[in-house]
C-alpha cells in the first residue's frame, strides 16, 4: 500500500448582521484545518457610519487585534485585510460593532484540510 497525503481545499464564506454591540463570533477554524482568510468585508447600511473591532483569538485564549475601532463610512463597503490571513485549527475571528443594527460583515476563506489516500 502507498499512502499519500493530499490537501482538500474548500471555499467558505461566513456572514453576520451585527444587531447589537456585543462581541460576536464570526468564524472558527474547524478541526484539522488551516484557513487562509482572503477577505473580511465590512459595510454600514445606516447612512451614519459606524466603528468595528475585529480580533483573532488563538487556542491559548490570547486575543490579537485585526482592526480596532476601525471607522466604517456609511454606504461604503470596506475591505479590512490588505493581505491574506492564515488562521489555524481552533482559532476564532470575532467582531464587535460600535453601534447596533448598522454593520454587516462577510468573511471569505479557503479551508485546507490534509487527507490521507491509500493506493
Could you say what each language-model-derived stretch is?
Residues 53-57, 106-108:
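Beta-strand signatures of extracellular beta-sandwich domains
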Residues 36-38, 50-52, 89-91:
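A generic structural signal for short beta-strands and their flanking turns/coil linkers
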Residues 7-35, 39, 96-119:
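C-terminal interaction-tip segments
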Residues 55-57, 93-96:
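Short conserved beta-strand and strand-loop elements enriched in small hydrophobics
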Residues 1-6:
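Short, Lys/Arg-enriched N-terminal segments with co-localized hydrophobic residues
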Residues 59-92:
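Intrinsically disordered, low-complexity Pro/Gly/Ser/Thr-rich segments with frequent PxxP/GP/PP motifs
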Residues 57-61, 112-114:
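Short edge-strand/loop segments of extracellular domains
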Residues 42-47, 98:
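Short solvent-exposed strand-capping/beta-turn motif centered on an Asx-Ser/Thr pair
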Amino acid at each position: 500500500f502507498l499512502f499519500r497525503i493530499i490537501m482538500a481545499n474548500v471555499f467558505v464564506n461566513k456572514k453576520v448582521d451585527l444587531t447589537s454591540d456585543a462581541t460576536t463570533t464570526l468564524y472558527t477554524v474547524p478541526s484539522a484545518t488551516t484557513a487562509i482568510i482572503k477577505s473580511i468585508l465590512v459595510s454600514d447600511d445606516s447612512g451614519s457610519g459606524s466603528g468595528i473591532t475585529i480580533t483573532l483569538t488563538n487556542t491559548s485564549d490570547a486575543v490579537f487585534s485585526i482592526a480596532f475601532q476601525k471607522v466604517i463610512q456609511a454606504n461604503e463597503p470596506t475591505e479590512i485585510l490588505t493581505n491574506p490571513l492564515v488562521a489555524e485549527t481552533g482559532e476564532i475571528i470575532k467582531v464587535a460593532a460600535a453601534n447596533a443594527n448598522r454593520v454587516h460583515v462577510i468573511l471569505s476563506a479557503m479551508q485546507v484540510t490534509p487527507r490521507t489516500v491509500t493506493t
